Amino acid sequence: MSKNIKILVIGAGVAGPAVCYWLRRFGFSPVLIEKYASIRKGGQALDVRGIATHIAREMGIYDQICEMRTRIERGRFVDSSGKVLHEEQGEKFGFRQDDEVEILRGDLVEILMKTIADVPCYFNQSIISIEQNADNVTVIFMDGRIEQYDLVIAADGIHSAIRRMIFEKNEYQLIHLGAYLSTFTIPNYLGLSHIDLECEANNKLVSINSDNNPEIARAGFMFRSQHLLNDIRDEQEQKQFLRDTFRDFGWETQNILNRMPESNDFYFDAITQVKMNSWTKGRIALVGDAGYCPSPLSGQGNNLAFVGAYILAGELKVANGNYTRAFTRYNALLRSFVDANQKFGVWVSESFLVKDEVSKEIAEERSNKILAMIKSISNGITLPQYESS
């Protein structure tokens, strides 16, 4: 197989543009598609930490990430009446240390997309069929076009359509960790400035913060529940579930929920892990949350995406496009790092959403444990060195 192979990358989140960057840098010809009409703005706050900060520097984007980072200066735990129980400096409140940075998902994707300006990118594009044989992969697009590629890399997230198309149901597991997460923006009606407020009790958590844009506040909800929605993707069912769950929670909860209809960036999902014995099948590979989501609560999905993208592209380079050899190495090199991060994801899920209100002692003990564990886990892989073409 010639090195300059044609590779279709699906998904313009974090992992998709990241793997396109490294593929292009290593001499391949990637093409990126995204089902949405444009880059989604805002979104959850993501951390760039550990080994991912090294990769970001290698990509030349670390300084840009720092410039666009969130700037929460203080975090406060409050009770149901709004009384402050405990206050922490913003970086510790977000479990960050050293050169680690928090940035909104949309801002990070925008930075990544600028690094691949020379890569063909097609929005509002999705796939209805994929078939592979010994020579190539035939892809049928929603608009009826039929194209052939040497390889396909799916970076289309935790609910990956490509994973469902290619892998049998017994080849992957979506493990619900017994909790849900929702975020959305609303007007900054409390007049918050670079501060994050959280109320956590009865296995539920409500937060609201505002930093770079003083007009906007970002609300967050987390809660434990074994209830499974009839349709996890139905936004109206999600919102009603949220209202029912937090009906009597107190604090600012009802004021936030009353403003929820004003939001245009509502996000809701089960806190879930994706587990697989192999992230590749034939000529198709999964990268990021599509293959190994550690859970949104872990704060590590972004870092796994950076590391996975780098190793997948690098191994294809070393193998000179021999995908069988490269995919075998990709699975082997990443396995222990993924396993450690997924174990951490379970531990974090069990450590949050406590029964009682968060006292100073509980908050500090939890912060110190997480800071110690995450430093080790986020640096728990030695990256191979791949020479650029």
From Swiss-Prot:
Pfam families: FAD_binding_3. One of its GO terms (molecular function) is FAD binding. GO terms for biological process: response to antibiotic. Keywords: Antibiotic resistance, FAD, Flavoprotein, NADP, Nucleotide-binding, Oxidoreductase. SUPFAM superfamilies: FAD/NAD(P)-binding domain (SSF51905). Its EC number is 1.14.13.-. Transmembrane segments: none annotated. Gene3D superfamilies: D-Amino Acid Oxidase, subunit A, domain 2, FAD/NAD(P)-binding domain. FAD binds at residues 12-15, 34-35, 44, 105, 267, 289. The keyword Oxidoreductase applies. The keyword Oxidoreductase applies. It catalyses: a tetracycline + NADPH + O2 + H(+) = a (1S,10aS)-3-(CONH2)-1-(Me2N)-3,3a,4,6-(HO)4-2,5-dioxo-1H,10aH,11H,11aH-cyclopenta[b]anthracene + CO + NADP(+) + H2O; 7-chlorotetracycline + NADPH + O2 + H(+) = (1S,10S,10aS)-3-(CONH2)-9-Cl-1-(Me2N)-3,3a,4,10-(HO)4-10-Me-2,5-dioxo-1H,10aH,11H,11aH-cyclopenta[b]anthracen-6-olate + CO + NADP(+) + H2O. Disruption phenotype: Increase in bacterial tetracycline sensitivity. Inhibited by anhydrotetracycline. Consists of an N-terminal FAD-binding domain with a Rossman fold, a substrate-binding domain and a C-terminal helix that bridges the 2 domains close to the antibiotic-binding site. This last helix is flexible, is not found in TetX of Bacteroides species, and may contribute to their different substrate specificities. An FAD-requiring monooxygenase active on tetracycline antibiotic and some of its derivatives, which leads to their inactivation. Expression in E.coli confers high resistance to tetracycline and oxytetracycline, does not confer resistance to minocycline or tigecycline. The reaction requires NADPH. Expression in L.pneumophila confers resistance to tetracycline. Degrades and confers resistance to tetracycline and chlortetracycline. Tetracycline antibiotics bind to the ribosomal acceptor site (A-site), preventing binding of the aminoacyl-tRNA to the A-site. The hydrophilic side of tetracycline makes many hydrogen-bonding interactions with oxygen atoms of the ribosome's phosphate backbone. Belongs to the aromatic-ring hydroxylase family. This is Flavin-dependent monooxygenase.
